[in-house]
Amino acid sequence: MVVINGYSFKTQQLLTQQPDHSQLTQFVQPQSQSTHSVHPGPSPGQQQAGGSMTMPSSSTGKGKREWDINDAIVPHVPDQEFDEFNEWSDGHVRHIYSLHNEEAKKHISGWAMRNTNNHNVNILKKSCLGVLVCSQHCTLPNGSKINLRPAICDKARRKQEGKACPNKSCRGGRLEIKPCRGHCGYPVTHFWRHSGNAIFFQAKGVHDHLRPDPKNSSVSKRAFGRVPLAGKSANGSVAKKSVIAGLVKQAKQQHSLISKVLKRPAVSNPLAHTALDIYQYNACGKCAGYSHCTCSYLDDSTTARSHQLSQSSNYGTNSWPLSGSESSAPCETAANVFTVNHQHITYNYPIYHATPAAATAAPSKSPSLPYACSISELAAYQQSSSGNSFAMGVPVHGHTQCQAVAYDSSPQLATPEPEFINYSQIKHLGGGGGQEEISCKAEPGPTIKYNATVETQPYVEDNYDYYYSPKAEYEMQQHHHQQQQSHQQFGGNQTAGHHYYESSSGYNGVSYFDTGTTTAPGNTATGNGLEVGYGGYYDHYTSYEQQMAVAGGFATAGGSTAPTVAAPPGHPPPPPPPPTLTYHHHHHHHLHHPAAATGLAPSVTH
């Protein structure tokens, strides 16, 4: 048996009936034409080894080859029978190219053909992408239409679509894809197959669009920017200038960033100045405004005031070398500084003090926010704790002049930002919704919301929960407590509210804890009282604190406690209710004082 184009024939029929072979070819010819191929009929063939056949050309030219690209066995073609390469193959055609033909090996085509998945790995299948045309169907000066070759890459082709028409006379035209639908509504398909010494090519379908312009045509180059429309030199210079401008901008941005990074250690280094410098800066009452201190607080001649020199004995063996210093810089009285910030005190973290310069930029991690409170508040309140107290923000030394201090949404700090901060228990004030401005000229004191959680800092973000002071400041607070227990706060009760225990940090002192039971007056009804989640971490202490507060006669119902008016100068102030204290076994030393709700400032202020 011999298989020819899928038909089986007996060997005896081919060998013994040579005169009848013409009838065989006539039988095969209609079958081949019924497959929609336009090939001429084969000539009398010769049997080849392996079952393939070579059919030489007839006297009128090359004969039609009876093969299909999907055949299991394709015919063997002699070298003299190879076709010349055709770049614009159109219609149902078959070509056999030499294995050494460079164009055939590259599968080149004038049409925009892209690779398509095929189930047969031995056959390369390509489909036509169509042509790029103008949306306005404009006509070139030579009378032709815009027909540009689409890019094979999907990304590049998407960039081509929507570009302006390269025709100079076109107005508003855009390039768009006209897809190929020449093969039964589908793109025309090309097949390539390498077999033996030949490359077989077969096309199915007729292109229903014009031939696209080649890539190197002038219209194509002008359309896709390979040749500038306004001249090569002008466009090139503009592009070069834009690139240079972009590089200069990047360099400036990097330079500014580097300068900020280099300046930051000099500003925020917590150990840049000594403790004496920082204390002198904090003690300065001359600059009670909201900006940088203008005093030479780093000058050796400008030291603490005389009323602070009396406290130098408290700083022996500590980091505050105040002994032997004299006061030479006259500062304003501290009566015009009356903001008191009670802050949490924690000793189980390293304690650092930022530099005074950092106090203006560090509080909210943003240099754009102003520094809202002078550090001299600390010294002002230390002076008041030696026998005077502030009631609801009204100055006590008889000063009734207008104070240019207002509580706004900007951060207010009594001390610079520490190095380590626990952000888990921050208390939000909602952007200063309950803040009021300080009135002037002996008017009733405004409602200043503050307690042990530094409520004068209305942060929207979670920042600055705890503020730390060194051991020396805390011992100074303890010293003031011991001096003033008999005549100011506790009315002779020397042991009222004092719980001593030894912590792991070596501190033996008072354990103050704020459970959030002291609500600022006038703020509970307005929704600016203590938030629900504030005391959640210490819920087991809250009930005890509330019981102690009720037992001590401190009523928080309604949140409106009558403000206490300051006593005239020379008279001791009325004693505030005893503080509510809680003894607990972790190393967070917190201040809880019910006087914070009434505006009475306790003696511990750091």
From Swiss-Prot:
Gene3D superfamilies: GCM domain, large subdomain, GCM motif. Expressed in glial lineages within embryonic procephalic mesoderm. Expression is highest in hemocyte primordia and longitudinal and nerve root ganglia. InterPro entries: GCM (IPR039791), GCM_dom_sf (IPR036115), GCM_large (IPR043020), GCM_small (IPR043021), Tscrpt_reg_GCM (IPR003902). Residues 20-37, 490-501 have a biased composition (Polar residues). Coiled coil: none annotated. Residues 44-61, 594-606 have a biased composition (Low complexity). The keyword DNA-binding applies. One of its GO terms (cellular component) is nucleus. One of its GO terms (molecular function) is DNA-binding transcription factor activity, RNA polymerase II-specific. It is found in: Nucleus. Residues 583-593 have a biased composition (Basic residues). Residues 569-580 have a biased composition (Pro residues). Residues 65-224 bind DNA. It comes from the Eukaryota. Residues 20-65, 475-501, 561-606 are annotated as: Disordered. Keywords: Developmental protein, DNA-binding, Nucleus, Transcription, Transcription regulation. It holds the Pfam family GCM. GO terms for biological process: dendrite morphogenesis; embryonic crystal cell differentiation; glial cell development; glial cell differentiation; gliogenesis; hemocyte differentiation; negative regulation of crystal cell differentiation; neuron differentiation. PANTHER family: GLIAL CELLS MISSING RELATED/GLIDE (PTHR12414), TRANSCRIPTION FACTOR GLIAL CELLS MISSING-RELATED (PTHR12414:SF8). Transcription factor with a minor role promoting glial cell differentiation and a more significant role in hematocyte differentiation. Gcm2, together with gcm, is required for the proliferation of plasmatocyte precursors, the expression of Croquemort protein, and the ability of plasmatocytes to convert into macrophages. This is Transcription factor glial cells missing 2. It comes from Drosophila melanogaster. The gene is gcm2.
